[in-house]
């Protein structure tokens, strides 16, 4: 490819990104504000969660009916339609995010939810479609809606796009569902839903060892999710039967996080402990195990380097940018909020795991010759920093952990995008194969201050 052709492609990409920013800015004028007087509109269930998942499911069903030759023809319109569909959640979340920054002033309280909506789902067990956003979920929701269209643009020429791009969109919708769910049953449904598109992204568009990496990713995360599910079911059956009675549940129990948090706070007053100290410690350990594998933290991290090395660029961007944050988010949302006494009991253990992850990830990172594996191990180190902030049990530590989650969610996908560019140019991820970069990649040095944390 000649220099003029490369420059022409770059100009088209810059024009496309600039046009997207203009479209998003225009759409923001039509979407909600946190201080709107009309709260009857559900701005979360359909626009942020349901719309991406439904659209992606329709596109996947449509593409699966077409023959292979036909799929290459319909890939271009599906790619463009997927990009346009991803801009609507971005415009909505951007409008809400900036309002939240101004009005809430980074309030990280667990009981101040905006745009909260609740619908009875499975009345017999007390499960509901309950969604809302607070200071913990707002940054993660915006980060997800931002990264999905960016990932689509950065992998614009990916092969088999008729199914690839809808999977990215479905992944985004499932991730948003995790961050806005205020019902434990709903939370777990979206938690498991995120596994499906990522598994197929690695399996179908990955490298030569993609089957091994996809199976390892699925086995690790699914087994951890099963242990977490057992903990959630135990929590459901051990809670006082009057927990959900006032909400019309048949069993008298509930999956509602806000109710569980309120009751746990009330029980923990004085010498009382919600469910008892021993049971708190057991349930806390079961839930934390599931979240530590997803984070991931040492020694549960071995699935991550293989997944990143074999995953396509788009899969790595969403995996590093948002999917890893599900672990830290889940810790703060469920076990730490409901079982604070258990956090005190396990504080030293969690801090030790965080410190080991920080140091081990950094040391192993320095010895890697594969560029994507190097970035993957750096993510393990960064997740250790997040775990240390959580284990501090201080408001400033929680705020620092959330800031690190957000910052890593921006920087890490960009690093994997650069890795994808290197692979496209050198057809290799081995650092020893990358020579002669000074002439055509000199502008990358501009990014060094941000990578080193100097700005």
Regions from the PLM with identified roles:
Residues 1-50, 54-154, 162-166, 246-254, ...:
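Transmembrane helix-loop-helix hairpins at membrane boundaries of multipass inner-membrane proteins
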Residues 55-79, 198-215, 424-427:
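Cytoplasmic juxtamembrane interface segments
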Residues 79-82, 141, 165-168, 188-189, ...:
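Hydrophobic/aromatic positions within or immediately flanking transmembrane alpha-helices
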Residues 130, 179, 188:
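Hydrophobic "anchor" residues on beta-strands that sit immediately upstream
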Residues 150-156, 173-185, 199-447, 451:
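Hydrophobic transmembrane alpha-helices and their helix-loop junctions in integral membrane proteins
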Residues 192:
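Short phosphate-coordinating micro-motif centered on Lys-Gly-acidic
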């Amino acid at each position: 490819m000649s220099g003029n052709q490369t420059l022409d492609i770059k100009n088209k990409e810059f024009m496309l990104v600039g046009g997207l920013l203009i479209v998003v800015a225009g759409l923001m004028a039509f979407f909600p504000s946190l201080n709107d007087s009309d709260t009857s509109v559900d701005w979360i269930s359909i626009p942020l969660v349901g719309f991406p998942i439904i659209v992606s499911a329709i596109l996947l069903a449509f593409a699966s009916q077409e023959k292979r030759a036909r799929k290459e023809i319909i890939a271009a319109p599906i790619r463009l339609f997927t990009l346009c569909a991803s801009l609507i959640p971005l415009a909505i979340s951007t409008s809400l995010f900036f309002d939240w920054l101004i009005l809430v002033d980074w309030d990280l309280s667990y009981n101040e939810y905006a745009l909260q909506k609740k619908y009875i789902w499975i009345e017999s067990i007390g499960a509901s479609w309950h969604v809302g956003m607070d200071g913990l979920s707002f940054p993660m929701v915006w980060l997800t809606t931002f990264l999905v269209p960016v990932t689509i643009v950065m992998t614009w020429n990916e092969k088999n796009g008729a199914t690839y791009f809808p999977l990215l969109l479905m992944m985004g919708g499932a991730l948003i569902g995790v961050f806005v769910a205020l019902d434990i049953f709903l939370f777990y449904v979206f938690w498991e839903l995120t596994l499906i598109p990522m598994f197929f992204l690695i399996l179908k568009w990955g490298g030569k060892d993609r089957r091994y990496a996809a199976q390892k990713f699925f086995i690790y995360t699914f087994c951890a999710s099963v242990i977490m599910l057992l903990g959630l079911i135990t929590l459901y059956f051990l809670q006082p039967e009057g927990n959900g009675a006032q909400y019309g549940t048949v069993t008298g129990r509930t999956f509602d996080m806000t109710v569980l948090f309120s009751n746990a706070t009330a029980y923990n007053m004085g010498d009382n402990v919600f469910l008892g100290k021993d049971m708190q410690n057991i349930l806390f350990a079961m839930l934390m195990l599931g979240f530590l594998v997803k984070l991931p933290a040492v020694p549960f991290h071995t699935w991550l380097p293989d997944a990143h090395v074999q995953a396509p660029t788009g899969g790595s961007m969403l995996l590093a940018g948002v999917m890893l944050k599900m672990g830290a988010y889940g810790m703060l949302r469920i076990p730490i909020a409901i079982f604070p006494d258990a956090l005190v009991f396990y504080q030293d253990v969690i801090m030790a795991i965080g410190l080991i992850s920080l140091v081990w990830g950094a040391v192993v990172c320095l010895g890697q010759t594969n560029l994507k594996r190097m970035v993957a191990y750096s993510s393990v180190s960064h997740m250790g920093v997040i775990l240390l902030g959580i284990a501090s049990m201080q408001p400033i530590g929680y705020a620092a952990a959330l800031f690190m989650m957000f910052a890593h969610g921006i920087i890490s996908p960009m690093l994997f995008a650069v890795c994808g560019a290197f692979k496209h140019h050198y057809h290799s991820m081995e650092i020893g194969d990358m020579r002669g970069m000074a002439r055509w990649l000199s502008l990358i040095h501009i990014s060094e201050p941000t990578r080193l944390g100097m700005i």
